[in-house]
């Protein structure tokens, strides 16, 4: 059945390609294309350097979910093989150093609940489940001897229900027992997707491949993440956060580099003693020099301003000693450090102005060297035998694919989106710069409709990125291109607070949200208007997360916008104190209201407190279970505009967190964007999806 289905899909794709080839005409991007793209990630070079394992995510429209499979491409790019076909996702492929196995993590049905390690034998055969543990495996890394793995795993909460077992029913088939109350005693007690933080911390476990036994390396007094084996296999370096009796670890969020001997009963040794953040564990890794003497890691630039952190590359002796920051004067954030095979150089990725690229620096210190020129976004890099390097690269007109990086040039390895991209006619992306009224230099991107006609003025959409510590860059954006295909000029602006422009630019908005950013965004709109390409009477704005927050600020302060879409935002932050996951940021940047008074909170709540100034028809959206920026932020603004008789609507996505992940809801959201903008900027009525109740239509 599955083979027949795959064959039919292949025939349909081939027919579509042949039809396109015969017509020779490219078409505009449509909403139906949204889930036809494939998301390529996580390249891992094999020990012999001849293969690259990686993952490909695609959408199963029938099941209404995303599916991720493991693939493998040859170094010369001539062979590309899909290795897994399970309906459950497979992630984090890792080669055993002897090249015999390729492991991955998956929650496939098996002996134990949740993510487990599975093995593919290179000699052939189906994947076999390796681990059978009751904890939650976050990562698994091979030891140099190929006989052990280090697991990052949170012990199973004994109060947590087992989803694989039916709920216990009482005598005579009575209803199942009610779940136990949730007991909260942590300072930072909520996290989006995770939920209420009652689970034990992540710990390191040493797993024996032959005996299939896992032994604890670290205790529950140390949160551990991002482990890396030493070249000789005797030690493991990792990022850790100490949990002391009487010390509320959540108030400090201080991660340091640790080293532990790779055997049960060993005591972790703290290598660094930094009163700040060595990059959040999810964004960093520690790397050993080939001789085992040095460790490379990421150190934050602002110890108390993690939200605007610009990571710096640092090294420290593995035995302990004074760290040395190698990129202290570079003034750009870096990520993913790793030593060259000879140990003389450290490679890393740089977040620069509207781009991301690989670079290097001598391990002894010196100047940063950019490895590849041009506009684009290189977001991942791995190095293998004979200094072979593979990167994940994207551009304005090409989704991310794998490339071999050879002598400063890219050689294509994968082609998962080629057939679709060959059909499409895309809008041109241009850079622009402007000056805000306070003299700040502001940069952005502008996308024109594919059939743009010089001299004609188009409706404009200002689409605001979230973060704020992120940026719009030269990578493929389905959203920008879809809006352009629907006849809009789209602008994306890296306002103050964005990454890619240095530490001062990134931290400029700390404790002062929704003010300088608005100045920058207004300057960009003014600049694009002066170019003569947009109609000043047909301006729209929108964004998600911090982009939604700034959308609320824009429509409260700038009355030129005729339509807005505000997703997962808030305009009254004090109402989210203790309700969302940002308690540390509130206290560090603004201060508790009983300590600093209401004035600083009032300043950042302008849109809600001046909602009567808003005339822009606005669509609010959010996830029902968002703990990042809870739905209450959108509900309050919706209620305010509804009370003021300003055209508005609130869309709630059931069961969704901050990021909308269900494919049908992603389509729904984009369809509503298009319909809202078309109605208020073009005077067109476009169909919208059915809603849960007639009142919501």
What residue spans do the PLM features occupy?
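Cap/lid segment of the alpha/beta-hydrolase catalytic domain
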Residues: 244-245, 303, 408, 416-537, ...
């Amino acid at each position: 059945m599955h083979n027949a289905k795959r064959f039919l899909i292949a025939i349909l794709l081939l027919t579509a390609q042949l039809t396109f080839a015969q017509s020779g005409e490219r078409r505009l991007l449509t909403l139906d294309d949204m889930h036809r793209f494939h998301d390529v990630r996580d390249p891992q070079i094999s020990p012999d350097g001849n293969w690259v394992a990686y993952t490909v995510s695609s959408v199963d429209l029938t099941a209404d979910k995303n599916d991720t499979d493991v693939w493998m491409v040859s170094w010369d790019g001539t062979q590309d093989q899909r290795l897994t076909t399970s309906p459950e996702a497979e992630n984090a492929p890792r080669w055993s150093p002897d090249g015999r196995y390729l492991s991955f993590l998956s929650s496939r049905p098996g002996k134990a609940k949740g993510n487990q390690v599975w093995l593919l034998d290179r000699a052939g055969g189906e994947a076999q489940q390796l681990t059978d543990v009751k904890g939650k495996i976050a990562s698994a890394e091979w030891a140099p001897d190929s006989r052990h793995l280090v697991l990052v795993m949170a012990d199973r909460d004994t109060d947590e229900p087992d989803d694989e077992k039916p709920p216990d029913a009482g005598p005579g088939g009575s209803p199942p027992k009610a779940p136990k109350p949730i007991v909260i005693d942590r300072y930072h007690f909520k996290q989006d997707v995770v939920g209420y933080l009652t689970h034990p911390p992540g710990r390191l476990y040493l797993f024996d491949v032959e005996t299939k036994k896992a032994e604890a390396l670290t205790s529950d007094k140390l949160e551990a993440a991002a482990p890396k084996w030493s070249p000789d296999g005797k030690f493991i370096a990792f990022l850790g956060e100490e949990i002391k009796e009487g010390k509320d670890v959540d108030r400090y969020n201080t991660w340091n580099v640790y080293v532990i001997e790779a055997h049960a009963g060993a005591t972790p040794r703290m290598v660094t003693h930094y009163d700040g953040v060595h990059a959040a564990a999810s964004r960093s890794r520690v790397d050993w020099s080939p001789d085992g003497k040095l460790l490379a890691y990421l150190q934050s630039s602002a110890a108390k301003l993690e939200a605007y952190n610009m990571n710096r590359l640092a090294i420290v002796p593995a035995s302990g000693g004074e760290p040395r920051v190698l990129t202290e004067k570079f003034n750009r954030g870096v990520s993913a450090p790793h030593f060259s095979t000879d140990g003389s150089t450290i490679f890393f990725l740089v977040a620069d102005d509207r781009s991301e690229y690989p670079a290097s620096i001598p391990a002894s210190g010196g100047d940063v060297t950019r490895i590849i020129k041009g506009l684009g976004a290189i977001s991942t890099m791995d190095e293998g035998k004979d200094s072979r390097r593979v990167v994940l690269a994207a551009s304005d007109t090409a989704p991310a694919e794998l490339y071999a990086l050879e002598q400063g040039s890219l050689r294509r390895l994968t082609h998962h989106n080629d057939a679709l991209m060959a059909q499409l006619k895309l809008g041109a992306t241009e850079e622009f710069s402007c000056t805000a009224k306070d003299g700040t230099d502001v940069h952005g991107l502008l996308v024109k409709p594919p059939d743009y006609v010089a001299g004609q003025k188009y409706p404009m959409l200002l689409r605001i990125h979230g973060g704020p510590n992120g940026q719009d860059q030269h990578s493929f954006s389905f959203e920008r291109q879809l809006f352009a295909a629907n006849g809009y000029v789209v602008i994306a602006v890296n306002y103050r607070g964005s990454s890619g422009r240095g530490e001062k630019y990134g931290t400029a908005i700390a404790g002062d949200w929704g003010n300088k950013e608005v100045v920058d965004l207004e300057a960009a709109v003014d600049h694009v208007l002066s170019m003569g390409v947009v109609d000043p009477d047909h301006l729209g704005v929108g964004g998600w997360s911090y982009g939604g927050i700034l959308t609320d600020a824009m429509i409260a302060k700038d009355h030129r916008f005729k339509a807005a879409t505000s997703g997962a935002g808030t305009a009254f932050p004090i109402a989210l104190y203790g309700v969302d996951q940002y308690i540390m940021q509130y206290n560090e940047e603004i201060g508790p209201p009983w300590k600093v008074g209401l004035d600083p909170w009032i300043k950042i709540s302008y849109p809600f407190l001046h909602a009567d100034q808003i005339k822009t028809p606005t669509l609010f959206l959010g996830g029902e279970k968002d703990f990042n920026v809870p739905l209450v932020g959108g509900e309050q603004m919706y209620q305010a505009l509804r009370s003021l008789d300003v055209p508005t609507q609130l869309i709630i996505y059931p069961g969704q967190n901050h990021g909308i992940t269900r494919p049908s809801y992603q389509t729904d959201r984009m369809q509503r964007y298009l319909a809202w903008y078309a109605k208020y900027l073009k005077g067109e009525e476009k169909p919208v999806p059915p809603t849960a109740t007639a009142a919501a239509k």
